[in-house]
Amino acid sequence: MKTYLDLLEKVMTKGEVKKDRTNTGTISYFGTQSRYDLREGFPLLTTKKMAWKAICHELLWFLKGDTNIKYLVDHNVNIWNEWPYEAFKKSNDFKGESLQDFVEKIKTDNQFAQQYGKLGPVYGKQWRDFNGVDQIEWVINEIKTNPFSRRLIVSAWNPGEIKEMALPPCHSFFQFFVNEKYEISLQLYQRSGDLFLGVPFNIASYSLLLLMVAQVTGLKPAEFIHTIGDTHIYSNHLEQVKIQLQREPKKLPKVTLNPDIKNIFDFRFEDISLENYEHHDPIKGKVAV
């Protein structure tokens, strides 16, 4: 995925040093766009090993309309744990538990999970119930009946509920486009992109969503277009980025879906198959909360 490496290089060389909410510090570049052609392979990063299982389960979690981390931790997906843990630490019930203790309690104590595993009305809530509108159901029906519409939009940005969210949506707005060949593309607008940790995850997640929507609407997947506002590299990821830029991308893998699935809400992890994924070693980095 040279396209992604070019984006890293651009931000490293043309970005500006900027303070941020987390007090970590970033190099930021405002306004970027990258295109990934799914006809040439699935855009899962090869210059470091990606957590494919986590990517799939998070997307399925969004599609369920779920906003509690219990489903994720039950499947050993730990990408959202820090935010509810930070909220738990401010509660009267906090007795010095570690993050690991917190996650174990989410797994084993349903009542605790219901109280402290909540993230507020984040992505799943907005996708499936934006002020009473199931946007995923609506957009799929619209694609089927009016594929050339310019209104094939789903928004996770709900100003009236932002303050109730553990984290306001970074990937906040996406739109589908169907051409005369009945090929479908998806463009995501992401207000804020953590280029080392988050963005590769987002590329794969929305590309997978595009494959799913294409299948259930009877269309052919074409491009994922990724538009990012504040495109940044955290200062504690700079060395990891330099390592990644030295690596040669490998051939892109292939993703196939169970062809029997005709309703997007019926997909399960077992219906998604990643094939021929060749990759370099993982590169770890700390998430900024």
Curated annotation (Swiss-Prot):
Disulfides per UniProt: none
Biological pathway: Pyrimidine metabolism; dTTP biosynthesis
An example molecular function term from Gene Ontology annotations: thymidylate synthase activity
Catalytic reaction(s) noted: dUMP + (6R)-5,10-methylene-5,6,7,8-tetrahydrofolate = 7,8-dihydrofolate + dTMP
Residues holding dUMP: 21, 150-151, 191-194, 202, 232-234
One GO term of the biological process aspect: dTMP biosynthetic process
Documented EC number(s): 2.1.1.45
InterPro entries found in the cross-reference section: Thymidate_synth/dCMP_Mease, Thymidate_synth/dCMP_Mease_dom, Thymidate_synth/dCMP_Mease_sf, Thymidylate_synthase, Thymidylate_synthase_AS
Signal peptide: none
Top-level class of the enzyme under EC nomenclature: transferase
Active site: 170 (nucleophile)
UniProt keyword annotation of Methyltransferase present: yes
Binding site for (6R)-5,10-methylene-5,6,7,8-tetrahydrofolate: 194, 288
Places the protein is found: Cytoplasm
Chief localisation class: cytoplasm
Pfam family, one: Thymidylat_synt
GO cellular component: cytosol
Keyword line: Cytoplasm, Methyltransferase, Nucleotide biosynthesis, Transferase
Recorded family membership: Belongs to the thymidylate synthase family. Bacterial-type ThyA subfamily.
Oligomer status and interactors: Homodimer.
Physiological role: Catalyzes the reductive methylation of 2'-deoxyuridine-5'-monophosphate (dUMP) to 2'-deoxythymidine-5'-monophosphate (dTMP) while utilizing 5,10-methylenetetrahydrofolate (mTHF) as the methyl donor and reductant in the reaction, yielding dihydrofolate (DHF) as a by-product. This enzymatic reaction provides an intracellular de novo source of dTMP, an essential precursor for DNA biosynthesis.
Name under which the protein is recorded: Thymidylate synthase
Organism annotation: Mycoplasmoides gallisepticum (strain R(low / passage 15 / clone 2)) (Mycoplasma gallisepticum)
